[in-house]
Amino acid sequence: MSKNSKAYKEAAEKVDKTRLYSPLEAAKLAKETSSKKQDATVEVAIRLGVDPRKADQMVRGTVNLPHGTGKTARVAVFAVGDKAEQAEAAGADIVGSDDLIEKIQGGFLDFDAAIATPDQMAKVGRIARILGPRGLMPNPKTGTVTPDVAKAVSDIKGGKINFRVDKQANLHFVIGKASFDESKLAENYGAALDEVLRAKPSSSKGRYLKKVVVSTTTGPGIPVDPSITRNFTEE
């Protein structure tokens, strides 16, 4: 839905920019303002009160969304031998080592998440400049550098998402599809916000959640009250 289209403008008029919505209200409104032509993704954008330039204020983490994302993630795994077999059995979409690294160096990036066994990380480091900026670099803090590749694959396929603050102190993550019931979207939102709050750096001073906006990929932004995370039923 183009921002200049009549449909988008009509959808935007439904959003009261002078107020903050509860998570459940925002979920309902996201569904109402989404294009009916496709099952749009519902996203959350958060402005944090941190300085990402400081190492002790880096915010990152993972969360298993209780209702998944509505999309089956494509997972790449860097592993060999038994670990490679375990990854394939768990449903990994592509598994390899040097061959996979060469493929990525050649431009292949048809996956949503990457996992590596610890022994592969020295090799994977060769493509850090490719994977890092895209949020695809395996990292022990997000559980994507692990000897238990089968569990990591299953977690991601089951709706596990990663979040990481960018250089502008923003976080972006998915909480589902517009076809989800609003209560499921609100529960996914609450689970994700819990983890974001848990990841607050001790050195962060002042207001941590400065601004929260929920939107679909085809709809307008909906401002959400940052102080409310878990009102899953109608007020």
UniProtKB/Swiss-Prot annotation:
**Quaternary structure (record):** Part of the 50S ribosomal subunit.
Q: What Gene Ontology terms describe where this protein resides (cellular component)?
A: large ribosomal subunit
Query: Which keywords are on file for this protein?
Result: Repressor, Ribonucleoprotein, Ribosomal protein, RNA-binding, rRNA-binding, Translation regulation, tRNA-binding
**What processes does the entry annotate via GO biological process terms?**
regulation of translation; translation
Q: Which domain of life is it from?
A: Bacteria
GO-annotated molecular function? rRNA binding; structural constituent of ribosome; tRNA binding
Q: Which Pfam families match?
A: Ribosomal_L1
Xref: InterPro entries: Ribosom_uL1_bac-type, Ribosomal_uL1, Ribosomal_uL1-like, Ribosomal_uL1/biogenesis, Ribosomal_uL1_3-a/b-sand, Ribosomal_uL1_CS
Q: Where are the transmembrane segments?
A: none
What is the name listed in the Swiss-Prot or TrEMBL entry for this protein? Large ribosomal subunit protein uL1
Chain segments annotated as coiled-coil in the UniProt record: none
